[in-house]
Amino acid sequence: MSEIFDAKAFLKTVTSQPGVYRMYDAGGTVIYVGKAKDLKKRLSSYFRSNLASRKTEALVAQIQHIDVTVTHTETEALLLEHNYIKLYQPRYNVLLRDDKSYPFIFLSGDTHPRLAMHRGAKHAKGEYFGPFPNGYAVRETLALLQKIFPIRQCENSVYRNRSRPCLQYQIGRCLGPCVAGLVSEEEYAQQVEYVRLFLSGKDDQVLTQLIARMEKASQDLAFEEAARIRDQIQAVRRVTEKQFVSNAGDDLDVIGVAFDAGMACVHVLFIRQGKVLGSRSYFPKVPGGTELGEVVETFVGQFYLQGSQMRTLPGEILLDFNLSDKTLLADSLSELAGRSIHVQTKPRGDRARYLKLARTNAATALITKLSQQSTITQRLTALAAVLKLPAIKRMECFDISHTMGEQTVASCVVFDANGPLRAEYRRYNIAGITPGDDYAAMNQVLRRRYGKAIEESKIPDVILIDGGKGQLAQAKAVFAELDVPWDKHRPLLLGVAKGADRKAGLEILFFEPEGEGFSLPPDSPALHVIQHIRDESHDHAIGGHRKKRAKVKNTSTLETIEGVGPKRRQMLLKYMGGLQGLRNASVEEIAKVPGISQGLAEKIFWSLKH
């Protein structure tokens, strides 16, 4: 227990009402957030002589201050707790690493509705189907729908400005509502209705309606139409036969858990309208000494009560663990959703099968993750031994990419004890240097990255400079001149140059820009982690450079036209669907773009043609 914090005096001031408490360390950092039905009773439990776990002992030893927020109800306390956890990311709380909103398929409310992927708040008028586990699942479904039900997926800006149908119409993947006369309003509306029914899990209704239309077309001797509908029926049947279908109308999330070697995996199976839309594994950050019950309870609360998750609640949640606050969670979710949400922990029949499947997937994903972590841990340990460091908790690597000196981009990738930290990868656009001067580019990116205050936990143990002696000399010069509040001598600067014939395994490493470097055996685990982070940095730089080059390619032609500034360039490209669409447009079509006069449209047309 802290010598400064007076627990007895503090507890005398605490109420017995429900609420949330925040614990701070000597640096004023929130280290733990908790909720309680009775704040006095809960907080008193931290200062007993016999504490429940080593984790609690370590937590209490660091407490310097506690803030309390009283709430009207337990539900308010539960919501506030998870908002604080998301805000402060306390080190002693179980943390959900990925709380991005899930993607949906969006069917717009336009005159000619379009299909698209959507994330975030649902402001646009239309219908939302999902959620799907990731963007790939949505894109795959959209591609499938486009083959079966050819309704448009183009942006409204493209749709409104077309005078002739696009390639999607030519290959039979869109009915072409953008051009009058290509499809009747009734036919387009019918295909939209099929999509609506299909995404709602009502495949039988789609097939029934299609079969009726096919039979009518045959009776009317419209054999080509009947054959087209027959092909559509076969496509729908092929899709529905492949789907794992549960009881009709099931709308639930199934959550399985695995826990081993201090790591937890929570696997979520998404079932909507009786169909398994997909699944996803999560690996929450678990402080040492945490019990499985706390992992599950905190994960479920953060998963559903933080951010946009509360807008995607299913009717039922199946859990692989009996929560102590199950009733409170169900009541809170029901209150948020405005409808009844059931939380079930001991299902039977098909639901028990779902839970077993989720549990098996969690165990499999955890085994894979532990294996990967073991490998990266071994490699980092080997590298620490080579570099004579006690441990490597964080590494950063830099690379430069450009084309003939143009569109220079620097990348920074970050590894921790578990491998790549992709959320912390960064790209830097380099400007104000002589084209092709990689040394100046490295100098600039290092000053931008490290010439400011950095949190203690974000200071790297090793900074890897891809490029050899010259680049390492730049790094040394930058760090010698840094005037920063953090310990600039802590990171070890390591240069890496490609060896003979630029082959992997022949890399030369440098501690100093002068003198000879040294090599590691091709099968060295230390070399493997260096190759891994260097390749990640190279790929990240190349990716950023390609995006920048593509952007310049799309705008450079327009930049030479007098009267077309950045805003007009952006508007032209947006409304025409890119530079190619603009090249193919007529003067009249260009003049329809907001802010473009007839005279300017003619100038743009002739500039692009000649």
Swiss-Prot record:
Entry GO CC: cytoplasm; excinuclease repair complex
Compartment(s) of residence: Cytoplasm
Taxonomy, superkingdom: Bacteria
Domain called UVR: residue spans: 204-239
CDD domains named among the record's database cross-references: GIY-YIG_UvrC_Cho
Keywords for the protein's UniProt record, in alphabetical order: Cytoplasm, DNA damage, DNA excision, DNA repair, Excision nuclease, SOS response
Sequence ranges assigned to domain GIY-YIG in this UniProt record: 16-94
An annotated GO BP: SOS response
PROSITE patterns from the UniProt entry: GIY_YIG, UVR, UVRC
SUPFAM superfamilies documented for this protein: C-terminal UvrC-binding domain of UvrB, GIY-YIG endonuclease, RuvA domain 2-like
DNA repair recorded as keyword: yes
A molecular function (GO) term: DNA binding
The protein's assembly and partners: Interacts with UvrB in an incision complex.
Record's function text: The UvrABC repair system catalyzes the recognition and processing of DNA lesions. UvrC both incises the 5' and 3' sides of the lesion. The N-terminal half is responsible for the 3' incision and the C-terminal half is responsible for the 5' incision.
UniProt-listed HAMAP family: UvrC
Family: Belongs to the UvrC family.
Name the record gives this protein: UvrABC system protein C
